[in-house]
Amino acid sequence: MKLTVFGANGLTGRLLTQLALAEDHDVVAFTRRPDAFPIEHRRLEIAAGDVRDAAAVASAIDGTDAVLSALGVPFAKVPVSVYSDGVVNIIAGMHAAGIKRLACVSSSVMSPYPEPLGGFIFEKIMQPYVVSKLGRTVYDDMRRMEAIVSGSDLAWTIVRPSGLFEAPAVSAYGVAIDHIGHRFTARIDLADCLLRQALSDTCVRSAIAVATPGAKPSMLKLIWQEGIRKKP
């Protein structure tokens, strides 16, 4: 299978690219900074461009079998539109190329079924601050992205991880429709889940939660890594 990966130079995108190549898939890795992309492989094609450039996006999609979006941006005080603008161009490119399968990363924050998982400090102080203050503009745009994707005629899947952390290998992670009772997701599990969506139609036209049971990373480290530090 040939896959186009958007956000390929991010931490999740790199893992996704590596996993796909390890399974002998062909990958088109779309990135704004091709000079900084660290992966080389005979089955890899690097496509330079910005996801807000419709022509570049369409060119990267043409001739592939499925599209995976691992787009991500740090928290910002200013309005964010990368997710929504990007997915509009991705969907247009898929329509032009006659491609139907799309899986994209969102966040467990988007779930309409919140669960009490973190205790008083997490639920009453940390999470509300991150969602409504620190990450408000990012999550606002994720909501727009989800609405655009779910309103399309594509065979889409929205993948919602919980707090992301690093792990050395894919685990026996959990997947469920809409929500799952765990607070954290190993990034490599998220990448593997995205790849599985491209290879299956089990969760088509669904939002799924993916999480790593038993994980207990530092919440403050996660907030810094996912929302504050500059993305690669």
Which ranges hold each PLM region?
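Conserved Rossmann-fold NAD(P)-dependent oxidoreductase catalytic core, especially the SDR/UDP-sugar
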Residues: 26-28, 34, 78, 88-146
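NAD(P)H-binding glycine-rich loop region in Rossmannoid oxidoreductase-like domains
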Residues: 4, 35-89, 93-96, 202
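Mid/C-terminal beta-alpha module of Rossmann-like enzyme folds, strongest
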Residues: 2, 178-232
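Conserved beta-strand positions in the Rossmann-like core of class I SAM-dependent methyltransferases
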Residues: 4, 28, 157
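Short, polar loop motifs at secondary-structure junctions
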Residues: 30-36, 161-164
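Conserved beta-loop-beta element that borders a ligand/cofactor-binding pocket
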Residues: 146-167
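Glycine/proline-rich active-site loop of Rossmann-fold NAD(P)-dependent oxidoreductases
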Residues: 112-115, 168-171, 197-206
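N-terminal Rossmann NAD(P)H-binding glycine-rich loop of SDR-like oxidoreductase domains
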Residues: 3-23
